[in-house]
């Protein structure tokens, strides 16, 4: 089985599966610019700042979230001002819901998932990073994409 490396600067469907892809979606009444905006926004305790980052996508979202990635509190994430552990089942449920909402609301995202069927998904830029290093590990990212793809 061939592999598909997921990168924002690679050809379709790879770029469309990247967290940097601009797949806007609404979840719990909140507008997200894309999945990177969702991920980076969850680092932010202040609800107003969080909502601003939620509305971003791609590199702009990543850059906005970087200032909140302090090592001493990296294990704490926030959903509308409520703190929770990055290591908790609540985090897995929240990011899984976000990916499903993005797929449901964006045909292009679903098309890219469909086009990747029969390929082993990889995101080697994140390989070797642990839950202590990143908001979403390669395994977590690939697992949620596989779950989405299998549900098509």
Swiss-Prot record:
InterPro entries: Phage_T4_Y12G, YbiA-like_sf. It comes from the Viruses. Pfam families: Phage_30_3. This is Uncharacterized 17.1 kDa protein in Gp30-rIII intergenic region. It comes from Enterobacteria phage T4 (Bacteriophage T4).
């Amino acid at each position: 089985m061939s592999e598909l490396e997921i990168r924002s600067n690679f050809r379709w469907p790879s770029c469309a599966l990247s967290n940097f892809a601009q797949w806007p979606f609404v979840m719990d009444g909140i507008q997200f610019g894309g999945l990177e905006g969702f991920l980076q926004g969850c680092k932010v305790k202040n609800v107003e700042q969080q909502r601003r980052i939620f509305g971003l996508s791609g590199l702009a979202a990543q850059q906005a979230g970087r200032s909140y990635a302090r090592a001493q509190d990296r294990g704490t994430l926030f959903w509308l001002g409520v703190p929770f552990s990055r290591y908790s089942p609540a985090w897995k449920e929240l990011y899984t819901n976000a990916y499903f909402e993005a797929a449901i609301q964006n045909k292009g995202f679903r098309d890219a998932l469909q086009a990747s069927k029969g390929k082993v998904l990889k995101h080697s830029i994140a390989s070797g990073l642990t839950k202590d290093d990143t908001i979403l590990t390669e395994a977590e990212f690939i697992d949620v994409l596989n779950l989405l793809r299998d549900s098509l």
